[in-house]
Regions:
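Glycine-rich phosphate/adenylate-binding loop
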Residues: 6-165
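Short, Asp-centered acidic motifs that coordinate Mg2+ and/or phosphate
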Residues: 2
Length: 165
């Protein structure tokens, strides 16, 4: 059995992760999300019977604010857009990045099915930063430090080098 969460909402995904853990649901969960303005996408593979989970992708800053340590967006920037109040708030990204995140997921699923992944991992794909830069946003050190287009890191090592902003 597999659970796929492609809604891109970290709060819902954290709730889902905690629900799965607290109810001892042993299933592979794929969390899929896109970064703003096509600068990248991510897929986390988490099995509740393995060490480390979706919570490991988050940390708190000196003010106690939670943030995604794997984000390609430098911390402290608001990249969301709003149309018609808070019900119309969204993160802008193009259709092509959704195709990339779908392929990233399918490749990770294939490796998982073939037994080639033995621990919980985060797979990240760098996208084109043209529109992101044009909009005046700053990329995180994570984006800058990732040399390859696609990176796969065990969640056990996710905090190594990922706490930089």
């Amino acid at each position: 059995d597999y659970i796929v969460s492609a809604i891109g909402n970290h709060n819902v995904n954290l709730w889902l992760n905690n629900y799965i853990k607290s109810n001892n649901i042993v299933s592979a969960v794929f969390y899929i999300w896109n970064e703003a303005l096509d600068i990248g996408c991510h897929v986390a593979l988490v099995k509740s019977d393995r060490e480390y989970d979706y919570n490991n992708l988050f940390n708190r800053d000196k003010n106690g604010e939670m943030y995604d340590i794997s984000s390609y967006v430098k911390k402290g920037q608001d990249v969301s857009k709003s149309y018609g109040g808070c019900t119309g708030t969204f993160i802008p990204y193009g259709a092509s990045i959704s195709l990339n995140s779908s392929m990233l997921f399918l490749n990770l699923l294939k490796k998982h099915v073939e037994g080639r992944i033995s621990e919980n991992v985060l797979c990240s794909e760098k996208g084109d930063d043209f529109y992101f830069n044009k909009a005046g946003f700053q990329k995180s050190m994570i984006y800058e430090m990732q040399k390859d287009k696609i990176s796969m890191r065990p969640l056990s090592k996710i905090r190594e080098g990922f706490n930089a902003t």
